[in-house]
């Protein structure tokens, strides 16, 4: 949006280069590597009117459930926790008279470096169904962490590879890297069967009592790949975040209803505001990070989130 009463949407899902006051201090320029350039000029005349017209075009977020506006508590990146640890966190909040609405299990509810195969670690959580029942009896909603990757260490990795559910290189070999976990591969959500497999795992967790999902990652999608449906790898780099969050959102909408559906999402692209809510990325518990989060929230709000 500009101070002259209009907004601009560059309608390209691939990388877009913006020059903001660099070549000419009074101008913003944008470009894409393509044979054409498509963009929309959205009239105002006020910022509110621009945003209203933009969301008519790209979609509007559903109103999140009332409980999602309460306080969330997370294990964060605690690497060694069990039900007793979880209860110590929750009881500590009660002792301090801090009302709690949601408890979130981050990545180590699953076995380390098998992310994401949706199986509770039986050594630390031998009775996940019972634990969830006990936590919900305290009036809590339950959120669990997921991502769109699968570690080579997972027992289901070979099955997923053989069925073609994972992203491939142009030569047909499996695309992998080691930057998050050894031998990481990416679910190919352009494959309908891969989507069904992933969605069924989520539905199993919902049936267990899970209320929402932290859809972590979804960015840094490689471009030296071959998608199941033949999609352009350059365009999928950003669009992947949309189809990933859409898949998880639809599972919740179909199981608990749109009025109760909510995500705890990290990545996004144009239109992903339809799948609320998003968080501003990892931050520290200090005043500097609080300021960063406030600035991020203001920016996201003006981007329709």
What are the functions of these language-model segments?
Residues 2-305:
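Catalytic-domain carbohydrate-binding cleft regions of carbohydrate-active enzymes
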